[in-house]
Amino acid sequence: MKKFIALLLAAVLTLALAACGSKNDTNTNDNSNDTNNDNAPAAVTGTVATDGSTSMEKVIGALSESFMANNADTTVTYNPTGSGAGITAVQEGTCDIGLSSRALKDEEKAAGLKETVLAYDGIAIIVHPDNPVSDLTIQQIAQLYTGEITNWKDVGGNDAEVVLIGREAASGTRDGFESITGTKEKCQYRQELTSTGDVITAVSQNPDAIGYASLASIKDSVKALNVDGVTPSEATVKDGSYKVQRPFVLATVEGKALTPVAQAFFDYATSPDAAAIIAKAGAVAAN
């Protein structure tokens, strides 16, 4: 009997100790979970598909590289189809974020699209480096593109016919240029090209050509003209003194949630942390 009581007491003591140990273990796990939830958000993974403006290539490229460097299991793709095609792509759900180098039109907003201004970019008026012209007024630019002025000598240049280079009808850069210069549906283009790079290349190969392109994409192979006496630069775009400028827009579908990884990229791109990267790419961050 004494042996049985001794064994019973030993069993009770063992169970009590086990219960205490189990309670302590549970508390430890709860604290660990709380710590993880508060201080270590889940890492995002997957692919973000962007589509649209060729003018936004440098800005989106720089933001994508930075985002992927900080999020190892992510990929950001960029399809340089032009602003109009990018807007269509996001409407049709073939990309996460549409890229437009113009503000969305009222009918696009009415169709359910939302614009978020990422940055502002100058539209540079470009000529061949050998062209002696260095400054044009907005009025002169309009007169050149509508065919009212057809010879460079009439604006201080050589005695040569002006060759007008522009973008295709769906281009956001073209929309911005024609809106600012008041030349919508009036331009007498010799060539209508499908990308910023193509315009720069065409102008760089023709001493008599004039074109327009994203300031963020300008290369030494062409010369950017002053407009109304103002040099196109990040500073003059920012202070508004350079008038030929437009927004870089992220287009999304109103009321439709982005995937977690697309939302993370969107939040990063529009945050103050991205401003320096956008500036390095040649544009002025909206934040």
Predicted regions and their residues:
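Positively charged n-region of N-terminal signal peptides that target proteins for export
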Residues: 1-4, 8-9
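Exported/periplasmic ABC-transporter solute-binding proteins
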Residues: 4, 21-30, 34-287
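C-terminal motif of bacterial Sec signal peptides marking the signal peptidase cleavage site
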Residues: 15-19
